[in-house]
Amino acid sequence: KLALDQAGLPAELHTYVDYPTSFDSTKTQKALKGSGIEVPPLETYATRVWDYWERNLDPDLFKDRSLSAAVRGKVVLITGASSGIGKATALKVAGAGATVLLVARSLDKLEATKEEIVAGGGTAHIHQCDLSDIEDIERMAEEVLTYHGHVDILVNNAGRSIRRSIALSYDRYHDFERTIQLNYLGAVRLILALLPAMRGRKQGHIINISSIGTQTNPPRFSAYVASKAALDAFSRVIASELVDDKVHLTTINMPLVRTPMIAPTRMYDMFPAITPEEAAEMIAKAMINRPKKVATRLGNFGELLYAVAPKASDSLLNTAYKLFPDSQAAKGKKDEARDKPPSTEAVAFAHLMKGVHW
């Protein structure tokens, strides 16, 4: 039953797992003997009975699968809520009736997000925090638990991306430290702070915004992808420990989103990317269905390709490595305007591999 529940399948299926189902009409025939009533063959009416059950009696028909049903009255903490995906998600869940806790560094931007939520009739609270500072995370988490008692849904969205080839990273160890600090260690520290209350209440949902990069291994993103992959692995490991506590973990391998995080890479202006609102819709669906993983078809294909043909995958990615050069900023030059526009081949490749960070 537990395995079926984790797979999102009806618990009733467990009765059909270990042995075949048999239908015996012996008792019915005995009861009807002499009455002139005969038992019809099962195949003549079984489909009608099953169809009636599916249309009228299936308990799943009566479940409210709306975002409002998933979040109304719940406390939802969103990191990186001052802009981009975080802001779009905050506006969406607040509109569905959640109490939203807005977490980010920029107080001005947080206040602007809160004003939009309140103007729409929602409820939001600001908890300013530098999510790359472990001590500040501890302070913020204590503040949240003091004021709100618990968090029902945690969305670890705040992140830092660095696009730089390994050839330009020999003397930039701090790039790896910075991405690990925010994308992995900061998220883990917040989870550790909020998890005891979730376990104590026997309910909770942690949503980690990862990247399609952990599936597709795009060149020049070694620092960024490694930090996201660390959080993915952490989530997979602790998920089994939290089953009995009814705390769910969801990893979203987000494709390229047009947010301030990708703005410094000018060539992305010409590449296909989803909007923050579309990303927020992915997160909203995760809140409703609580899946283990949310990913695009291209991301899943990239993961499969690397699993079955890693060298072929490397060859394909090497083509991308040659098509998309390091930016002037990655080379340490401040004049980003000197970046050459991407070639026709590069733009075509980016559209073919829509959503991947190049």
Q: What would you call each of these model-derived segments?
A:
Residues 211:
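Residue(s) in the substrate-gating loop at a strand-loop-helix junction
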Residues 75, 82-83:
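Conserved glycine-rich cofactor-binding loop
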